[in-house]
Amino acid sequence: MNQLLNNYTTLALINKATGDALRLEILRALASDAFGVMELCQIFDYRQSGMSHHLKVLAEAGLVSKRREGNSIFYSRMLPSKASPLFLLQQQLYRTLDQIPLPEQRVANVQQVKAERAALSQQFFASQGDGYREQQDLIAAFDIYGASVDQLLMNSPLPSLSHAAEVGPGDGEFLPFLSAKFQEVTALDNSATMLGQAKHYCEKAALSNIAFSCNDTQFFTQHPQHFDCVVMNMVLHHTPSPADIFNDIAAGLKDKGVLIISELCRHDQDWARTACGDLWLGFDAEELEQWAQNAGLSSGQSQYIA
């Protein structure tokens, strides 16, 4: 009886939350991205107190969840539980919302927020020299995950061994593994400083089949279905919109192409923001799987390293 009443209460809260046009727009904006309160205020040109109220109503209805990233709280769309009798209602709500585009100005504001995040990341890496590796090693040294990524690569069925790419190669430590396996390799980074370090590393190793591109992942949309494999080692937590990264890379992969990601599990080490330039404090496996699925990719092998 209590559960039945709870279901009616939740249904009433959902109806209340979705009975406001702005709250529906907020849910639409949170389709694949997470935003902080101030970012949502910027996107919707709305006062903070009012935005906080709308987010509270959506949270009470179980339509948004929040996660703490250091001193900041980010909101994202809450996925419906398949065990809930309201699963179909919530699923259909999201499907309907996602068929309705946000107004052009809202879209422009979203892109501005992402551009500001990207600028912070680029400023950090532009200021980095050899000291970056020392900081990065404090949280995720290449020696910890490099061999595991190579093993995943060796075990992955690939369309061919023609073209591979690494997004954010750091100082280039994984590029020799790709160079030995593929005919052509692209090292992609939107930081000229970091790309220069990777290039210097490869020159010292006399690797001749690697091209270096100072670009973001929109590069893949300009080279559709070109790559057999794309690798991202400890990069996603530096990106302004992880969902966009998946979409971009999916466009550049050949049919049955492989995307290999090594990433941090969600953690609470806030010092990584200032020391390592992290925008996100790791991710849950379910988040990665959802972004991959939304981009038209399917999950493959997984491995967890302590």
Task: Indicate residue ranges for each PLM-predicted region.
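Amphipathic alpha-helical dimerization/coiled-coil segments
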Residues: N2-Q3, K82-G131
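N-terminal helix-turn-helix DNA-binding core of bacterial DNA-binding proteins
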Residues: N6-G50, I73-P80
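Conserved alpha-helix/loop element of class I SAM-dependent methyltransferases that forms part
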Residues: A140-L161
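Class I SAM-dependent methyltransferase SAM/SAH-binding core
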Residues: A165, G170-F219
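A short acidic, Gly/Pro-enriched loop at the edge of an enzyme's catalytic core
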Residues: Q218-V230
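A short SAM/SAH-binding and catalytic strip from SAM-dependent methyltransferases
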Residues: C229-S241
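A short glycine-rich, Lys/Arg-flanked "PGG" loop and its adjoining helix->strand segment in the class I
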Residues: A243-V258
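C-terminal alpha-helical "lid/dimerization" subdomain adjacent to the S-adenosyl-L-methionine
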Residues: V258-A306
